[in-house]
A protein has these predicted regions:
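N-terminal type II signal-anchor transmembrane helix
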Residues: 2-40
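Positively charged, low-complexity intrinsically disordered regions
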Residues: 4, 47, 212-215
Length: 228
């Protein structure tokens, strides 16, 4: 009995160490990518931003500062003439929750023309948003907009898909309640990103994606609208 307990204990410790080691590897691997917060460092040769979605409200109903910062960053790039269009990609899990529609609404209220905004309601996860940016919208060198840690994760995914993306980091809220939660969340999200890239390929249904690409007019609309 003692031998069984000891063996179980050692296996549990080994499992925890392997899990922690894999987590650290994933975190550092993703963290090797770089972003910028400086609009002047963004060249004008990139025509599209990929704006990654999140809820516009926190639990309790207060405005989400992460969401507001992403919208403001997208507007800054557009008004500085760095981008011609924005792909607002997020979760539209049901008719009562539609991240892309909210982003489009707030972007237009901030002065971005509605004609410059494309929405992707199937960006359920970061991997989905990035691969759909490439394969559905035909954009292979976007400026990815989100907070720094999220941008790095998206850049890692984009790089694995052969895309030449750059990251424009929206300001990250500094309150301790956000810092602790997001550090923990990002640790696990980066592990999932590495698994997505190397094993599962996200939640994308490849057959459905290829069918959508074949039937989609997004790319041709973009070409007509922005001369790409």
């Amino acid at each position: 009995m003692l031998r069984f307990i000891r063996r179980t204990f050692y296996l549990a410790v080994a499992g925890i160490l392997c899990f922690a080691g894999f987590g650290v590897y994933c975190y550092l691997r993703v963290d090797s990518y770089h972003t910028t917060e400086d609009v002047s460092k963004i060249g004008r040769e990139r025509h599209f931003a990929l704006l990654l979605g999140t809820s516009n409200k926190l639990v309790g109903g207060a405005a989400n500062p992460f969401y507001l910062a992403r919208i403001e960053s997208a507007v800054r790039l557009y008004k500085a003439g760095k981008i011609s269009g924005i792909i607002a990609s997020g979760d539209n899990r049901d008719r009562y929750y539609n991240e892309p529609a909210r982003m489009k609404r707030d972007l237009t209220l901030a002065g971005v023309p509605e004609s410059a905004i494309l929405t992707d309601p199937m960006g359920l996860r970061t991997y989905d948003s990035v691969i759909r940016c490439r394969d559905v919208f035909g954009v292979k060198n976007p400026i990815i907009i989100s907070q720094d840690s999220h941008c790095k994760r998206a850049l890692y995914i984009a790089d694995s898909l052969g895309m030449k993306a750059i990251g424009f980091a929206a300001p990250t809220p500094t309150q301790s309640k956000f810092r602790v939660y997001n550090s923990a969340r990002e640790f696990f999200a980066r592990m999932m990103a590495v698994i997505d890239v190397n094993v599962t390929k996200g939640s994308v249904d490849v057959d459905e994606l290829l069918k959508e690409v074949k039937e989609s007019k997004y790319f041709f609309d973009i070409a007509k609208k922005f001369g790409k």
